Amino acid sequence: MSLRIAARTNFSVLKECEDWLIVDKPAPLIMHPTGKSDEVTLLGVLKDAIPGVEFFFVNRLDRETSGCVLVAKSSSVARKLGKMMGRREIKKSYQAIVSGWPDWKEVCVTEPIRRKGEFEESEIWVKQAVHPEGKASETGFRLEGIFKNGGDRFAMIGCEPRTGRTHQIRVHLEYLGYPIVGDKIYSDQGRAYLDFLEKGWTAELFERMRLDRQALHAKGVIFGWKGKVIEAQSLLPNELESFCIA
């Protein structure tokens, strides 16, 4: 029996000025229309909440990732912020709950990333992987805490992506041997994702994944704007907080 996971749409505005706003995106809210359905999107709820403004996403989060999204209110501001992002002048920080207890306090992963289907057969088109001929990638990780849930070991990891590759944090954590809880593509060798496509969300899949979303949260963003340092922080969502203290 397939279960339906309703999109959470109760986003909040963390910071705002005449040029941009930073919103706190819930999961599993998708960012923008895909053309395949009339599914609720962050772009749609923004337009409903703040009519008359054209929005441009400066950074993007996967459907199942929550947290800070920087949104420009004009194309010119979007271009400027995009260039700042390319120059690494916008710093982003994440939190991830992973399976297992790492034996390190801090580690920096610089393994290049490439779409897996480009170098070997993959049933999941979008899946990425570490590969020597991939694009240069760098992520810093910091162990923030360890805990148990249902007798199993888990850890909270602080993540700082220093490049912007697709699924970068998820790929590098899988490479380290500590996949993100609830990640259907980069844990269980992707079998959960294929099962989800075939059967939808089921009670059996929830039992395997432990969460109805991947445990990755865009915690903060910091950048300079018109002579001021802008910083926004998003609290860990209730469903992830509850998992840590269960």
What are these regions (language model features)?
Residues 1-138, 142-151, 229, 235-246:
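RNA pseudouridine synthases
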Residues 38-42, 46, 145, 151-223:
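Pseudouridine synthase
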Residues 224-228:
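Short strand-coil-strand connectors
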